[in-house]
Swiss-Prot record:
Catalytic activity: D-erythro-1-(imidazol-4-yl)glycerol 3-phosphate = 3-(imidazol-4-yl)-2-oxopropyl phosphate + H2O
Enzymatic class: lyase
Presence of keyword Cell membrane: no
One term under GO cellular component: cytoplasm
Gene this protein is translated from: hisB
Main location: cytoplasm
UniProt protein name: Imidazoleglycerol-phosphate dehydratase
UniProt keyword Amino-acid biosynthesis, yes or no: yes
Alphabetized Pfam families for the sequence: IGPD
Amino acid sequence: MRHAQVNRNTLETRINIKVNLDGSGKAVLATGVPFLDHMLDQVARHGMIDLEVSAEGDLHIDAHHTVEDIGITFGQAFTQAVGTKSGLRRYGHSYVPLDEALSRVVIDLSGRPGMEFNVEFVRARIGEFDVDLISEFFRGFVNHAMVTLHIDNLSGTNAHHQAETIFKAFGRALRMAVEADPRAAGAIPSTKGTL
């Protein structure tokens, strides 16, 4: 099984993440940020990834450090779980609609961190959650998972729907990228021979 556990402790946050890439979509989430729990549940369910996240952070200030550090720690756990990437598809993509909203996410397990985040949320907050933190979560993930990630919200008039389509599409793109390629026979999916 491809799984990992990472603990990350700083003066601002204490994060513990367990990930199983060959899971059934089970999530146990206690981030202290309810909207982030809801979004991570989408990643687990649609990515068929078992995901456990517990976090304590300086939420008396705001959720920035907690959300960003969860992204960082998830990226670290993902890197450990995915291993050498031999025999994997490497690339994943997904379009996900939710009513009027539509988002596209494309990922490359390239070994090179890079992100394009093209999302104009229709409002600045979803309940108490600052939508700016969504890009911070993904940036933390990208920089520590060493992946290239393109996120595009193509339509939407409801910020919750915009966010949910992004996280669902991210889960589905991850699932595709980490699947075994039956024709690859365990080879590294790169002409360089390494990722």
